Amino acid sequence: MQFTTTTLIAILSALAVASPIEPRQNATAQQERLCTSAIDTAMCCQTTLAGVINQTCTTPAITPINKQAFRAYCAAQGQDSSCCKTPLVGDGVICTPP
């Protein structure tokens, strides 16, 4: 009996952990993912070499709620909106458009 109860609790716990939970939709604005990759960082960049390597990048001082707001914020700073990965070696940052 104890083995059955323990096994049942273990199975139900595993199911609860494995089931995805969808975020609730409500009237407030939800933040859109600015970059497609989870390892990218949304940054405003100034100098671009071949459209890929950026030297002067900063993170936005605000948190834009969508890509249009992100582009507008960076444009107001005189920079381009980019999704960047910091390389392990070197000074440059590898970036792509959002």
From Swiss-Prot:
Disulfide bonds join C35-C83, C44-C74, C45-C57, C84-C95. Coiled coil: none annotated. One of its GO terms (cellular component) is extracellular region. Disruption phenotype: Does not seem to affect germination and growth, formation of sclerotia, ability to penetrate and infect host tissue, nor spore and mycelium surface properties. Its main location: secreted. It comes from the Eukaryota. Pfam families: Hydrophobin_2. Aerial growth, conidiation, and dispersal of filamentous fungi in the environment rely upon a capability of their secreting small amphipathic proteins called hydrophobins (HPBs) with low sequence identity. Class I can self-assemble into an outermost layer of rodlet bundles on aerial cell surfaces, conferring cellular hydrophobicity that supports fungal growth, development and dispersal; whereas Class II form highly ordered films at water-air interfaces through intermolecular interactions but contribute nothing to the rodlet structure. This is Class II hydrophobin 3. It comes from Botryotinia fuckeliana (strain B05.10) (Noble rot fungus). The lineage of its organism: Eukaryota, Fungi, Dikarya, Ascomycota, Pezizomycotina. The gene is Bhp3.
